[in-house]
Amino acid sequence: MSVSRSELREKIMTILYQIEMYNKSKFEYKVEDIIRENINISSDFVETIVNGVIEKRNELDEKANGYLTDWTIDRLDNLGATILRMSIYEILYTDTPKIVAINEAIELAKKYSDENVRKMINAVLDKIVNE
């Protein structure tokens, strides 16, 4: 079964969102179990980004906050913040072309967030790429 990178990114977003909700609820979990629940194939891409975002979350938030005017990432809706974190991680720590990471983030934001969040994600990612 072949799954596109776009589909995998959507799964990554779902996994990271689920982890975020579990953390807020103080629910115990294993990252590997959440990955397995959401995707039935082995994917280094998924594991790399999920684990990387978890490991570097504070750094990713600081990076985003540096470009959010009169906002912090904590004020975004949970899905918007998740999309932003995973996209910043992909831009900074993977060999994915930056334009691809931005476009994929925008597509996820169009589907799952409102117009204001989409614009904010686009602006932050653009600033990161051009710093």
Placement of each model-derived feature along the sequence:
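N-terminal interaction/assembly modules
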Residues: M1-E131
